[in-house]
Amino acid sequence: MRPSYLGKILLHWCDTCHVPVLSDVCGCGAATRKVGITPPGDARPAFPADCELVNRIFEDHFGAPLIPPGTIALLNKAPDTDRMEEIIMGGCVVGAIRYITGEKRWEPLPRPEAALFLRPARRYVVVDEGAVPSIRDQGASVLAPGLRVIDPSVRKGDEVFILSPDGSCVGVGRAKMDAGEASAMERGAVVRTRKNAPSRCVPGQSTWEDAVRANSSVIEETEAEAVRFVQEVAGNTERPANISYSGGKDSLATLLVVKKALGNVPLLFIDTGLEFPETLENVAVAAETYGLEVIRASGEDAFWDAFERLGPPAMDYRWCCSACKLHPVRRLIEERWGECLSFIGQRRYESFRRKESNRVFRNGIVKNQISAAPIHNWTALHVWLYLFREQAPWNPLYAQGLDRIGCFMCPSSDVAVIGEIQEKYPDLWQEWSARLGVWQEAHGLPPEWVTEAQWRIRGGVCDETYRYC
């Protein structure tokens, strides 16, 4: 799938501090270097649950975890049929993990730089010294005459590390046959080497507190621009202001910016009845922490009424946002203020649609609301560094491996994420699955429409750039 270019990729790395930096100069004064990641380049911190997932995948496959304790790692979502995450450590992409929906499993995709952080205990091959230059420098395949050792666990299609006789990594690739067959071969290709451009990688230990210090000037400048924007927009209208709060990281960052710009303004929360329990708790915690009123609109009844008529929402049939969010908030605004100014946590790096959106706009359905996006040009890393600096109460779901917070059964969720939600929230998912089952039987749909989450796409194809409401 083609990458989406939604803005300049800002990720750099400081080899002195061993941290990501969002400018060409680190807070320590050292020059930084660009990190080559796949667009849109909205990299985010790898939280403990993320690190556990990556390490489990690599340990299951190669017999060794990838992310060492005390090492900062980031994840960058890359375009794929379901979910693929690039893993960034030491200032470069050291590999990726990809979810294979048909097999319901994760696959590791290492790059040679991964060998700076792990030594494979299985699924590796060792080649003759004479074969090293062509494999390392030209990306040549591993041929049978140059094969010295192949780990017995290697099966056709496996990702493998290619090692020199001294144990250093000279490449990575995919096995073209089982180990037994390869050992008996006298000629032919054993491993198809994957060509990856060499990247500078400097391992080192650091913390996110170090990263906040390294980015202090960037965060201050970014915050100051957002505060000025809020003050300017609010100064140009007499409409009462509020903060559209969802319980996610972006709306929390927006809350902080608006509070610094305008003081206390109320939170506007749309309770669809489909939120995670942690999200509802976060709304309460944020309101209490910052002394803000919460004004609520409810869309739960509207969702189930529409479900009975339309079936489940899908990525290419997003009736849910208008039914459960836009129409309820329009009615609430009309009753409470008539018209209002809402500051929202919308960012251009989230989707093509949001990139094309103006920073100040009106929604076609909620015409009595002016929306303004103070953090429109922030990346996810800007947001997280800001929240870390402010010690803000962010939603604990992020620490559990979710990268975006919304309705628990959002059709924009990847199948990989849906599997995690089913496991962690069986009661929520059991009710949803039962509703899907009734619709499936009533319309003569196959069982896999439910079991393989085919309900998420009505037409069978969906443009990934439009996955966000």
Locations of the language-model features?
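Nucleotide-activated chemistry modules centered on ATP-dependent adenylation/adenylyltransferase
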Residues: 2-13, 18, 31, 149-150, ...
